[in-house]
Amino acid sequence: MIDLKFLRENPEVVKQNIRNKFQDQKLPLVDEVIELDAQRRTTQQQADDLKQKRNTISKQIGALMAQGKKEEAEEAKKEVAEFGDELAALDKKQAELEEEVKKRMMIIPNIIDPSVPIGKDDSENVEVQRFGEPKVPDFEIPYHTDIMEKLHGIDLDSARRVAGNGFYYLMGDIARLHSAVISYARDFMIDRGFTYCVPPFMIRSEVVTGVMSFAEMDAMMYKIEGEDLYLIGTSEHSMIGKFIDQMIPEAQLPQTLTSYSPCFRKEKGAHGIEERGVYRIHQFEKQEMIVICKPEDSMIWYDKLWKNTVDLFRSLDIPVRQLECCSGDLADLKVKSCDVEAWSPRQKKYFEVGSCSNLGDAQARRLRIRVAGENGKYFAHTLNNTVVAPPRMLIAFLENNLNADGSVNIPEVLRPYMGGKAKIEP
């Protein structure tokens, strides 16, 4: 949610930003907000003038009584009482106008960073850089679930009978590898100075609408029937929500957190759920990194978060690339974002395994996360980045470490989490 004062003073900037995101249907919202806000301010002024008049007359009542002018005092009391009804009507009107303004402001997209490439959708995202040397072995790499099944590590049929498509049972060394990757990622981030957290896996609707757009909410979130609770789609939701209505002393910034959680997603949209695979599913686990910082530091942290990703994948010897999200592919709250893509030797191309995002002060405005600084109070900036998100990470890991005989090599950094095991064998 952008600053209302900024929109009022820079309507054309906001409109051009909407055009850059190819959301022309939202252009009328800008003028609607300006008109509704003008009505709201007029109503506020009318209420303030009436309150001042009421206070003036109220002060006169005592003087009239002291002078023995009881009839005039009674008339003044009646006038003050009438002000009450009028003020109540004005307050109601103002509240209604504020709600209408808020509804529209929640839909208007955040102002993107000038460095973001202009494009309509993810087909126009721009490759920024690559790390690691992509390899294609001289043997055919099976589909990831075939690799897992040969290693007796996955049971999709049982999961389908129990819960439907989009779920899985991991077993044996594959389940252990899954936990090893999560544990290694956790310790990797702790070693970089991040505080480890395990957050609530459900959040209230106010937090949901504070951390994402309505479109994202509809496509992703599962609601608990009969409760004001939603299952989280990522631990970022809970971790940013942790600071709702908080005034953070500037000296306590930045807040650098790494959180683990299961994640639940409807995956309602163009891609949907895979019939037989673990790339796009309803339930998975993820290690996340979150930063709350001063506005002037957010782009610095954006680069730092991305470097953490590069260093982690390098330590696992998995080639990755950074793909800058174009304007049309950015979610409405994001200022700047890039996809983290890992190399797939089977497909001979990169595929998404995470994302790094700077949301500016959008989430902080919605959730009222402010900072008490030396020069006054201001809204914090929030950022997030995927550390690892198995099982997508497992797909990249298995393909890049597969041997011709179907065994999978375990990198040295993961062996302590695998009981010293150097290889998973059929």
List each model region and its residues:
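N-terminal alpha-helical targeting/anchoring segments
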Residues: 1-135, 149, 153
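TRNA-recognition modules of translation machinery and tRNA-sensing kinases, especially anticodon-binding
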Residues: 27, 130-426
